[in-house]
Amino acid sequence: MKQYVIVFLTLLLSAPLLGQTPDFVFSNTNGKIPVQAYKGYHYVKFPFQSKVTAYVTLKGEDTESVEVFPKGKVSEVNQIQNTVSIALYEPGVYMLRLNKKHKFFIFADEPYSLPTDKPIINIVDLGIDNTGRENMTSQIQKALENASGSGAVLYFPKGDYKTFPLTIGRNTHLFLDEDATIMADTSDIKRYYPTDDLGTKRFIYIKDAENVKIHGAGSINGNGKVLRTRYGDEARMRLMMIFRSKNVDIEGLMFKDPGSWNTQILCSEDVSFNAVKLMNDIELSNTDGFDPDASKRVLIENCFAYCSDDNVAIKITKTSGYMQNVEDITVRGCLFLTKKSSLKVGTETRGLLMKNILFEDNDVIESDRGMALYVSDGATLENIRYINNRFEYNYPDAKRCGINFVVRKRNKDSKLGMIKDVLIKDCFFENSFPKMSEIKSEAKGLINVHIENLYIENQKVSSLSEGQIEVKNSNIEIK
């Protein structure tokens, strides 16, 4: 018989004052778990052991509406006055939306533990400060280099590790404990200037590496808001850059506060992200989530991203001249919120072919555009599948449409590309988006889309008008 863990979450809201932050309390049978506040929303993390019943109480404000996401994973939601109870039967990411404005995220992760079959190197035992007061760049970099190829796990216990950019090499295994944070030093932007031919600033750099594993319940914090405020556009940097690497596995971590795109995967193969949480500053421009760029066999699964820009943008940027085709990208089982596009390919499509891309079983809670395909630089998009994705609310930004597929020339010298063999199947828009969806091309015969079992507000779409889809020079089949 499964052990039942009772979890109590109390949301304490006094009559709100200007600028006042709500107070939250979260506890279970093992005691209180600290609640984190970040940019107008709150979250809590804990290891999921068995069924969890959560109790949510909103004080100082009547609980007039309650929504819990993903809807398909939460079946037992009850309310007594201002208290809401929720039964969680499996690990994952859950979101509460109270009175259509208060967001609370629960990260109930699979428990992470140090491997027992490998030697462990505790980085603190190497004399490295974990108070966050001292910069430890050279010491941590040396530890990374020594761990590379050693067969040992480099272990970061609880604490704050302040550093400038770090490079992770081949055959490296890192484990970040819960409450362990690798944090970007904000004192000198020049230390982030690239020193190789890849002219992109980055904090954590995995370059020319194979067999890299980084996992655990810890965090990597780019301090992007502070850096951008202090240094402006100079501080637009990737929190993580994976470049020309193979067999990279990232699991369980939280990537927080990038200065620009959170994670770029450039010219790499066999890269996976599982249960990774991207927490971007939603008021900071250009903070994409996951950006697979000229890469092959990338898996993004059971992840979370809250972004000011695209949640996922699969592209070929030709960064510093590096370019190859895109193949076999899968985004599955994730929960996303964004002010821009959520499930996107493009806009940069500077290669020849981008094929075999699957978006499956994702929950998009907020987006300006749910599904987006943009070809502006002449590439061909082939075999793009949107299967069993759910879209809840429109975020009021530039386009405000559920589907936006466009083939155009970026400039007069650009070539026209193609979007072919696109399948939208078993996808649901809980609410209609305010503007018409668009599927448009500058010339005929360049876009082919098959739509099957598309629902808007519980009504099956059987025509372009019912789907609120405006079409130009495109072949669309609906059934």
Where are these regions (language model features)?
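Positively charged n-region of N-terminal signal peptides that target proteins for export
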Residues: 1-4
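Sec-dependent N-terminal signal peptides
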Residues: 6-9
